[in-house]
Regions:
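TOPRIM metal-binding catalytic domain and adjacent DNA-binding surface shared by DnaG-type primases
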Residues: 1-27, 31-34, 68-69, 104, ...
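Phosphate-handling DNA/RNA-contact segment within nucleic-acid enzymes
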Residues: 18-113
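Short, surface-exposed amphipathic charged segments that create phosphate/polyanion-binding patches used
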Residues: 25-26, 107-111, 151-164
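Acidic beta-strand-to-loop metal/phosphate-binding motif
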Residues: 76, 112-125
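Cofactor-binding loop segments of dinucleotide-utilizing enzymes, especially the Rossmann-like FAD-
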Residues: 79, 119, 145
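Thiamine diphosphate
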Residues: 121-122, 131, 147
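Short, aromatic/basic amphipathic alpha-helical patches
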Residues: 125-137
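A generic structural motif
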Residues: 139-149
């Protein structure tokens, strides 16, 4: 349904849990830069009222760190499926705000360019994030989705939106 192929399933090491606390959930693992599991998300396979189930430990991690090239522009998105649909240097926030470890890693690695792609209900969060990064000297592009979701738009349309986005500053 989400448009992922066997290469995506293999790359992201997706799994399925058929019993236990994550019964009937697709498991989306996240790995740190050394390839060690640092977090995971369980997504209900049958679209119940409780779509996502997170593990009972803090999510202050760098999502999909294993796949990030810190010398290239990075793309910050809300969820794991958004990141997987964009693929290239895309990091899930596991929510609408940036947590300390990810923020620290961005600054530590002297990332020069960031694209922020959040749902329209997270506009204020995106502005706060943008301001923090601009104050660090990082160029930030805010990608407008017009009520759509990166996963719904698909890879090609998202890449077009990213390329057509403009840098933000607080002088305008």
């Amino acid at each position: 349904k989400r448009g992922f192929n066997s290469e995506d399933i293999e790359r992201y090491n997706l799994g399925y849990c058929s019993e236990g606390p994550y019964n009937n959930r697709v498991i989306i693992p996240s790995y740190d830069s050394d390839g060690k599991l640092n977090y995971f998300v369980g997504r209900d396979f049958y679209n119940s009222n409780f779509k996502y189930k997170n593990p009972p430990f803090p999510k202050d991690v760098v999502g999909f760190d294993l796949y990030v090239n810190w010398s290239l522009p990075i793309i910050l998105v809300e969820g794991v499926f958004d990141a997987m649909s964009i693929k290239n240097n895309s990091i899930p926030l596991f929510g609408k705000t940036i947590l300390p470890k990810l923020y620290g890693k961005i600054v530590e690695n002297k990332v020069k360019d960031i694209f922020i792609i959040l749902d329209s209900d997270a506009f204020d969060d995106a502005i706060q994030m943008t301001e923090k990064f601009v104050n660090e000297g990082i160029s930030v592009n805010f990608v407008k989705l017009d009520g759509q979701d990166p996963n719904d738009l698909g890879y090609k349309k998202m890449i077009t939106k990213i390329h057509n986005s403009l840098p933000m500053d607080f002088k305008q």
